[in-house]
Amino acid sequence: MAFAGLKKQINKANQYMTEKMGGAEGTKLDMDFMEMERKTDVTVELVEELQLKTKEFLQPNPTARAKMAAVKGISKLSGQAKSNTYPQPEGLLAECMLTYGKKLGEDNSVFAQALVEFGEALKQMADVKYSLDDNIKQNFLEPLHHMQTKDLKEVMHHRKKLQGRRLDFDCKRRRQAKDDEIRGAEDKFGESLQLAQVGMFNLLENDTEHVSQLVTFAEALYDFHSQCADVLRGLQETLQEKRSEAESRPRNEFVPKTLLDLNLDGGGGGLNEDGTPSHISSSASPLPSPMRSPAKSMAVTPQRQQQPCCQALYDFDPENPGELGFKENDIITLLNRVDDNWYEGSVNGRTGYFPQSYVQVQVPLP
């Protein structure tokens, strides 16, 4: 039997080479069969490519996919089942926003509160994405894998067997073998032809099941985007409220502290009873102490006043009507805050507007 099988394989190989190299004509199948073969070949490529691209669609980061595959392989070798979920980008961004929102402090910062709200929304979207992954894998990828490993594999097996029996039949006819051998080869050829045709027909005419799987895919995507839209709609409303809250909050005035305010010890920040720095003798130098310079002296005096005022840090030359010009170290009485960048004030009997960046507030407006 072994020798007979080997001889048959040699005869089929001989027939194949004769057809390819010698120009011998083999049995031709009809156009309908060849069209089914073409569509089946396309289906084989489709199922393989569709699985690959769907996985890339659900998990687009190739580095993360490679890491997950490596962990899975190591787990199999070690005999330990170790789960490793794909890091959704929404989840990574959520973690970043939540972490730094909490570090900033939610009690005093509307921005920190908004970050936390945004992070929580992204976290919900990541959970919805995981549900989408599970749905697609179960209802779309698994049926494709089943088709690839069962239906397509069976059809391709019948086609391969048909090709071998066709070569055996043509070889026996070309060599003018005995009638019973030719008849036996023809019967087997006909049997394989029928199995291959039926298998390809059933595969190609199963549109209802294939389209149903696409419907499931589309429904899963629709549900995913609908849930994400609901989450984002709620987030947008919350952030609008946070923005209104931030706009309605009174702006805090900030007066930078000087070394005198800090009352530093040891490094020269302390003062003697006469107001001179403790580490400098009154006769140590004829030059005035920086802490007693006119600019600093003027900076201290207005703080004792009740009237809102500021000290000019630089010269300001007005360029437009209504602006108030002044010189460095001038003390300007604050009358009104125009906006975040401009004040209204008076100095030397003149009144006008001036930029906030040119002054240091000594006594803030009430």
Swiss-Prot record:
Q: Which family does it belong to?
A: Belongs to the endophilin family.
- Under which name does UniProt file this protein? Endophilin-A
Primary location recorded for the protein, binned into one broad class: cytoplasm
- Domain BAR: from-to ranges: 18-248
Q: Which domain of life is it from?
A: Eukaryota
Subcellular location, in the record's words?
A: Cytoplasm; Membrane
Q: What is the lineage of its organism?
A: Eukaryota, Metazoa, Ecdysozoa, Arthropoda, Hexapoda
* Keywords of the record: Coiled coil, Cytoplasm, Endocytosis, Membrane, Phosphoprotein, SH3 domain
Q: Which GO terms describe its cellular component?
A: cytoplasm; cytosol; glutamatergic synapse; membrane; type I terminal bouton
Pfam family of this protein, just one?
Answer: BAR
In its UniProt record, which GO terms are filed under biological process?
A: autophagosome assembly; cellular response to starvation; clathrin-dependent synaptic vesicle endocytosis; membrane bending; membrane tubulation; plasma membrane tubulation; regulation of synapse structure or activity; synaptic vesicle endocytosis
Q: Boundaries of each SH3 domain copy?
A: 305-364
